[in-house]
Amino acid sequence: MEPVKMTNSSDDFTQSAEPFKLFAEWLADAAKSEPNDPNAVALATVDPDGLPNVRMVLLKDFDETGFVFYTNYESKKGQEILSAEKAAMCFHWKSLRRQVRVRGPVEKVSDAEANAYYASRPRGSRIGAWASKQSRPLESRFALEKAVAEYTAKYAIGDIPRPPYWSGFRIRPVSIEFWHDRPFRLHDRVLFTRPTPEGDWNKDRLYP
């Protein structure tokens, strides 16, 4: 296997003043080197008692306004986000020995955004959004397959509408940290912070 050409070396990424541009470059590098799902990210939320939950989701879009993923709003993660209105995520690309951490308030995506993404999903995934009562107890695999069969029959012809409880969230970051592995644990870390999602970025280099 040929080595992956990096768009930013460990030495020069610390000079960047634009976190979203830097993230785009790192994600592009990951798309070349990661064997599966370079857009996979660990998403952290907290329950009403303050106990954290973390799980993997897929980043589906990002721009200067934030990082977007989709889920069932009635799931545990959906309910925790709707309650706390804050979340954090961590990208880790082993092949590149890089990590990006994101923290910030969360908002719902627009219906237009959710409809466009939902329409792009495979038909089976759209059926699954109706059939799965995400995070709730499931009697058996058969019960899930039965629900899939029922919704497949219901929507056998024509478009499959987006369930009202299925949509997306956007994390609007107030903190983005870039980390790159270096020998002897003397890693490179750069932290971008701002007081609000509309504010200007401040940049600090951190001790490893």
From Swiss-Prot:
Keywords: Flavoprotein, FMN, Oxidoreductase, Pyridoxine biosynthesis. Pfam families: PNP_phzG_C (PF10590), PNPOx_N (PF01243). The keyword Transport does not apply. FMN binds at residues 55-60, 70-71, 76-77, 99, 134-135, 179, 189. The keyword Oxidoreductase applies. Coiled coil: none annotated. Binds 1 FMN per subunit. InterPro entries: Pyridox_Oxase (IPR000659), Pyridox_Oxase_CS (IPR019740), Pyridox_Oxase_N (IPR011576), Pyridoxamine_oxidase_dimer_C (IPR019576), Split_barrel_FMN-bd (IPR012349). It is an enzyme of class 1 (oxidoreductase). One of its GO terms (biological process) is pyridoxine biosynthetic process. Its EC number is 1.4.3.5. Pathway: Cofactor metabolism; pyridoxal 5'-phosphate salvage; pyridoxal 5'-phosphate from pyridoxamine 5'-phosphate: step 1/1; Cofactor metabolism; pyridoxal 5'-phosphate salvage; pyridoxal 5'-phosphate from pyridoxine 5'-phosphate: step 1/1. Substrate binds at residues 60, 117, 121, 125, 185-187. Its cofactor is FMN. One of its GO terms (molecular function) is pyridoxamine phosphate oxidase activity. PROSITE patterns: PYRIDOX_OXIDASE (PS01064). It catalyses: pyridoxamine 5'-phosphate + O2 + H2O = pyridoxal 5'-phosphate + H2O2 + NH4(+); pyridoxine 5'-phosphate + O2 = pyridoxal 5'-phosphate + H2O2. It comes from the Bacteria. Belongs to the pyridoxamine 5'-phosphate oxidase family. Homodimer. PANTHER family: PYRIDOXINE-5'-PHOSPHATE OXIDASE, PYRIDOXINE-5-PHOSPHATE OXIDASE. Catalyzes the oxidation of either pyridoxine 5'-phosphate (PNP) or pyridoxamine 5'-phosphate (PMP) into pyridoxal 5'-phosphate (PLP). This is Pyridoxine/pyridoxamine 5'-phosphate oxidase.
